């Protein structure tokens, strides 16, 4: 290795990044020189020796008509001397057939020839065609059967001048000091970088492929990996553990052991790109340093020499075997030669040093490389390629995740999706979809009536009707699991575990358990009755959608469920003449039960609804007490008012007696007023009482054929109600929800004017009358 005085003497290309990196690598190169040749290798003034050698090479005459050979040469002549001309060496690497190609010769002739500068080393080697000398193939084939490609490319030894007859030992540098690592160099030392004078061919090849290990200091790896196209230094190249540029990849985590000759060879081979090798890369091969080609313009060499050199795909191929001989020009088909066909843009290639990758990753890279090659071939190919190109593009557009499922698996997924559309009751399972299309049908019907435009046909999803087997669900029960159900549901709520244990007597626990069980049974009855109510409310829609022959069965089923609801409310047991009010009162004590009764009343018959109203009137004070917090009883006023208009006069009178807690017969003793007082102090009770009085008065005035007994009962009830309204204070009287309009005429028949004004003031009827 030489340290050049200026960047112009450097044999690298005119790359600014390489020039900047050269100065940074000087210190590292000095360290490698010390480790290789000893600490005294650079003590002497070797720069003066290098300049002296450079002046000797400048004095060498470049003879254009020099003879190509002087007879037989021995093996040392084939390897070449140390002062042979690099320009002639490169000229002998040019293939004979390519020079005879007329296309290349025309390209060479059309380019302007640069005039060489006198006294400089930058003169072009293309100044004369006689410089391009042919390689003596037969001579090399006979005398050098085992010569490698690098030795094959070396030209013949030129004639020695008068100064070249001297041995190189006369120009040798002074003796160097002993190196602590590899000892001192031989006595006949030569400048650093000078090729060996004598070396046998087998040993030379063996040193290239399997060099002797020399322990050197491993350099620091680069912080960022360099791109594929950029040049890297030999130190960085040697730091690659599994590079494909080496003959034998090093194992991981082991620093490579290379000889100085291999470092110089890797410097030239690592820069090779697939398909092309520029002349500047030839200039970095050991033995070419310091030659006239080092100072030539690299762009000129890339334009002229790069087209004629055979492609060198990788560094290993450059040292393995010579390229195949090109057929003679007369065998070429008409058209551009193969060297011009190679000028087409090539598809991007993947770097070859992928031995460290996973086998699956390497296979993916290979597949991508094949796809890029096929795509490039289809785009740049000639002839009829329309069908093939379209099929290839379709193949590229193909979804990589396609055909991952078998047809059996696809059918299985389709069946699962179709099962969601199979329903015995689409209106219940897909309520919003059905209502949405009902609205659309109504809008379309309105548009047809108006006749604004043509009828629009809307596509509607047809849900298949499938017979669904109904089975009774029975939760799993385990004996001894705290004595409770293992599955919690609405019908079977799970008991919470008592965290606090209090000491109670057996009687208290028994009573509490009875109350708890009774309430739990009531909740279960409410849930079952609510389920029946929802089914009954849905029968109207089912009746409209059903066929004519199916409607009688639906009506019978509806009546049966209505009777079941009434039995659940009244709690009538088999064989019992009159149901007990206790069961109904327990339902009415729960807020959900009161709302449910208000929804059930319109579906019941008149007799059934009247029975519910009678039970409510008899137990109204107790229900008012339980409803003090919820205040849900007013929701029953509207269905009760509608029911009163369908009841006869006898039933209305009986209801009023039950509400006022009056005896059914005149012989019975007069009851206490606590019951009626509680009714008057509640807005629901007072409103219900006024509605009953108004409806009874209408029935009494409209039907003159009423018996005297019924008339007497009605008159007695009216006097009792009027007397109680006058007795109760106005502050204690509740404000009614609604007031009938015929109350003034009703009270005027039973009281005088003074009492009538007092009643009007209490009930705030003045605004309603006037």
Swiss-Prot record:
Q: Where is this region: Region H?
A: 389-448
Q: Does the keyword Nucleotide-binding feature in the UniProt annotation?
A: no
> Which GO annotations describe the biological process of this protein?
deadenylation-dependent decapping of nuclear-transcribed mRNA; negative regulation of translation; P-body assembly
Chain span(s) of sequence motif Nuclear export signal:
86-95
List all Acidic residues biased stretches: 7-33
Provide the residue span(s) of the region labelled Involved in nuclear foci localization: 1-397
Q: Where is this region: Region C?
A: 449-770
Segment Region N: which positions? 85-388
Positions with biased composition (Pro residues):
321-337
- Spell out the residue ranges making up region: Involved in RNA-binding: 223-397
**Residue ranges that the Swiss-Prot or TrEMBL entry lists as coiled coil:** none
Write down which residues bear the modification named Phosphoserine: 177, 179, 184, 278
- Write out the ranges of the annotated region (Disordered): 1-42, 155-195, 319-340, 376-396
Sites of the modification Asymmetric dimethylarginine?
217, 223, 263, 284
Q: Which UniProt keywords apply?
A: Cytoplasm, Methylation, Nucleus, Phosphoprotein, RNA-binding
**Sequence positions bearing Omega-N-methylarginine:** 385
User: What is a single molecular function from GO for this protein?
Assistant: poly(G) binding
Which superkingdom? Eukaryota
Q: Tell me where in or outside the cell this protein is found.
A: Cytoplasm, P-body; Nucleus; Nucleus, PML body; Nucleus speckle
Q: What is its main location?
A: cytoplasm
Q: Which residues carry this modification: Phosphothreonine?
A: 178, 194
Q: What's noted about domains in the record?
A: The region C, also named Pat-C, is required for RNA-binding and mediates the binding with the Lsm-containing SMN-Sm protein complex and the decapping machinery. It folds into an alpha-alpha superhelix, exposing conserved and basic residues on one side of the domain.
Query: What is known about its subunit structure?
Result: Interacts (via region A) with DDX6/RCK. Interacts (via region H and region C) with LSM1 and LSM4. Interacts (via region N) with DCP1A, DCP2, EDC3, EDC4 and XRN1. Interacts with the CCR4-NOT complex. Interacts with the Lsm-containing SMN-Sm protein complex. Interacts with EIF4ENIF1/4E-T.
The UniProt family comment states: Belongs to the PAT1 family.
> According to its UniProt entry, what is the function of this protein?
RNA-binding protein involved in deadenylation-dependent decapping of mRNAs, leading to the degradation of mRNAs. Acts as a scaffold protein that connects deadenylation and decapping machinery. Required for cytoplasmic mRNA processing body (P-body) assembly.
Which protein are we looking at? Protein PAT1 homolog 1
- Specify the species: Mus musculus (Mouse)
């Amino acid at each position: 290795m030489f340290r050049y005085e200026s960047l112009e003497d450097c044999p690298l290309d005119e790359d600014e990044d390489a020039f900047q990196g050269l100065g940074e690598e000087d210190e590292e190169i000095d360290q490698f020189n010390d480790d290789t040749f000893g600490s005294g290798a650079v003590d002497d003034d070797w720069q003066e020796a290098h300049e002296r050698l450079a002046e000797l090479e400048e004095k060498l005459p470049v003879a254009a008509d020099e003879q190509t050979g002087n007879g037989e040469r021995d093996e040392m002549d084939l390897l070449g001397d140390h002062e042979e001309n690099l320009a002639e060496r490169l000229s002998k690497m040019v293939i004979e057939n390519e020079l005879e190609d007329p296309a290349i010769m025309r390209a060479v002739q059309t380019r302007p020839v640069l005039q060489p500068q006198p006294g400089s080393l930058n003169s072009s080697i293309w100044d004369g065609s006689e410089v391009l000398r042919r390689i003596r193939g037969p001579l090399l084939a006979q005398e050098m059967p085992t010569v490698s490609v690098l030795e094959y490319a070396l030209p013949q030894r030129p004639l020695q001048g008068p100064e070249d007859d001297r041995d190189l030992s006369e120009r040798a540098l002074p003796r160097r000091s002993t190196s602590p690592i590899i000892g001192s160099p031989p006595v006949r030392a030569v400048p650093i970088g000078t090729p060996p004078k004598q070396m046998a061919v087998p040993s030379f090849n063996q040193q290239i492929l399997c060099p002797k290990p020399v322990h050197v200091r491993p350099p620091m790896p680069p912080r960022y990996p360099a791109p594929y196209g950029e040049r890297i230094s030999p130190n960085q190249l040697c730091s690659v553990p599994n590079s494909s540029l080496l003959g034998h990849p090093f194992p991981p985590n082991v620093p490579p052991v290379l000889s100085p000759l291999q470092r110089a060879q890797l410097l030239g081979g690592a820069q090779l790109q697939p398909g092309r090798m520029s002349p500047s890369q030839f200039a970095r091969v050991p033995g070419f340093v310091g030659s006239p080609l080092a100072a030539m313009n690299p762009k000129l060499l890339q334009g002229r020499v790069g087209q004629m050199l055979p492609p060198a795909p990788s560094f290993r191929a450059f040292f393995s075997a010579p390229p195949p001989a090109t057929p003679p020009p007369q065998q070429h088909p008409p058209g551009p030669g193969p060297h011009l066909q190679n000028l087409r843009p090539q598809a991007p290639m993947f770097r070859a040093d992928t031995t460290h990758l996973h086998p699956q990753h390497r296979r993916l890279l290979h597949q991508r490389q094949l796809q890029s090659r096929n795509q490039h071939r289809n785009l740049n190919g000639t002839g009829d390629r329309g069908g093939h190109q379209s099929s290839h593009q379709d193949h590229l557009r193909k979804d990589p995740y396609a055909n991952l499922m078998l047809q059996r698996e696809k059918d299985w997924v389709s069946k699962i999706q179709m099962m969601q559309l199979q329903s015995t009751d689409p209106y219940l399972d897909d309520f919003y979809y059905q209502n949405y299309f009902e609205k659309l049908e109504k809008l379309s019907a309105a548009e047809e009536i108006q006749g604004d435009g043509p009828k629009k046909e809307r596509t509607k999803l047809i849900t298949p009707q499938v017979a669904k087997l109904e089975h009774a669900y029975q939760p799993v029960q385990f004996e001894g699991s705290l004595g409770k159900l293992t599955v919690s549901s609405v019908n079977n709520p799970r008991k919470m575990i008592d965290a606090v244990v209090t000491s109670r007597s057996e009687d208290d626990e028994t009573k509490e358990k009875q109350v708890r069980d009774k309430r739990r049974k009531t909740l279960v009855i409410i849930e079952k009755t609510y389920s029946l109510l929802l089914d009954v409310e849905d029968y109207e829609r089912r009746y409209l959608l059903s066929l004519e022959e199916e409607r009688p069965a639906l009506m019978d089923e509806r009546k049966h469920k209505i009777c079941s609801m009434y039995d659940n409310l009244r709690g009538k047991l088999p064989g019992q003449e009159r149901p007990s009010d206790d069961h109904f009162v327990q339902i009415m004590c729960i807020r959900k039960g009161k709302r449910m009764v208000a929804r059930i009343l319109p579906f019941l018959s008149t007799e059934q609804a009247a029975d519910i109203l009678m039970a409510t009137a008899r137990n109204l004070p107790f229900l008012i007490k339980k409803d003090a917090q919820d205040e849900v009883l007013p929701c029953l006023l509207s269905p009760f008012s509608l029911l009163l208009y369908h009841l006869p006069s006898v039933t209305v009178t009986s209801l009023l007696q039950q509400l006022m807690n009056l005896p059914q017969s005149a012989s019975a003793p007069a009851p206490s007023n606590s019951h009626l007082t509680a009714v008057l102090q509640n807005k629901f009770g007072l409103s219900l009482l006024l509605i009953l009085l108004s409806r009874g008065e209408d029935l009494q005035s409209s039907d003159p054929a009423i018996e005297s007994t019924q008339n007497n009962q009605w008159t007695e009830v009216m006097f009792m109600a009027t007397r109680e309204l006058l007795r109760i204070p106005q502050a204690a009287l509740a404000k009614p929800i609604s007031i009938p309009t015929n109350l003034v005429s009703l009270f005027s028949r039973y009281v005088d004017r003074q009492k009538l004004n007092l009643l009007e003031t209490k009930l705030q009827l003045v605004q309603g009358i006037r």
